Amino acid sequence: MRGGGLALTAACFTGAAALVGIFAVALMRAAFEFTLGFARNERRGGTHPIIEHQAVGYALADAKVAIEATRCFCWRACHAVDVQSPGAQELAIEAKVHGSETAVRVLTDLMRVVGVESYDHAIPLGRLLQDALALPLFGGGNIGVRRRQLHAILKRPEYDPLMTCGEAEV
């Protein structure tokens, strides 16, 4: 269709946005699994594994909550894209922004549990953080592209905030 290039490109970027959120979940899960194992085994000169310390346990709990919330959100966005839901573009953009920015936060929080050793090349956390830092820029930057797209959606006179909830009339 002549003149439909922009719409076609936008549709391709919609699906890609949701997948960036999934990439973020994968990075967070890998970092969490490593850090959980580390916390269960590392004693840091004490008699008990560091997972017994409240600060470490809470950091792991917060990371797990963020991972599961992001996973569910991204699954919802990918499903909306797959079934061509009216709110798919909004959900995909939100999943990309939320997932990529949450991954950076969760990775740095988990690196604090491990400490300076997290930068050791034998430990995966440094590499995972490098990958996570690319996600807010990848597939349309969160600030320059994705938030602008979301802003445009929100400004539409016909915008229905319940569209992504499945509550809006279709």
Predicted features along the sequence, with ranges:
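Glycine-rich beta->alpha junctions and the first turn(s) of the following alpha-helix
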Residues: 1-68
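Alpha-helix initiation and N-capping motif
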Residues: 3-6, 32, 53, 71, ...
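Alpha-helical scaffold segments that form or flank carboxylate-/histidine-based iron centers
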Residues: 17, 51-62, 88-98, 131-134
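A ubiquitous short alpha-helical element
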Residues: 23, 59-63, 91-95, 117, ...
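Alpha-helical transition-metal enzyme core signature, strongest for iron centers
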Residues: 25-32, 60-70, 74, 96-107, ...
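Generic, well-ordered alpha-helical scaffold segments in large soluble proteins
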Residues: 31-34, 38, 76, 109, ...
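C-terminal helix-coil-helix/basic helical segment that borders enzyme active sites and/or dimer interfaces
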Residues: 40, 44, 64-98, 111-119
